[in-house]
């Protein structure tokens, strides 16, 4: 189980990313559209003035149940440990153990 403080920190980052998402997207679009280096420089300054945690690259996928930050399956939102346990307990419909 991950520390609750780390899980809360990740939630805070998700809120910030959602809050500044449209503004960040519009600035990046303006940077691509302008040809003047001075204007690009000003837009880049605006982009750098945004909070660091509002960048989407700062987000990290975590397990829905345990909060584990590594070895997550996107399809289920679970870590490999929880996925294995739930698959063996038949809590995930359609998931079968492979056999060849």
UniProtKB/Swiss-Prot annotation:
Its main location: plastid. One of its GO terms (cellular component) is chloroplast. Pfam families: Ribosomal_S14. It is found in: Plastid, Chloroplast. SUPFAM superfamilies: Glucocorticoid receptor-like (DNA-binding domain) (SSF57716). PROSITE patterns: RIBOSOMAL_S14. Belongs to the universal ribosomal protein uS14 family. Part of the 30S ribosomal subunit. This is Small ribosomal subunit protein uS14c. The lineage of its organism: Eukaryota, Viridiplantae, Streptophyta, Embryophyta, Bryophyta.
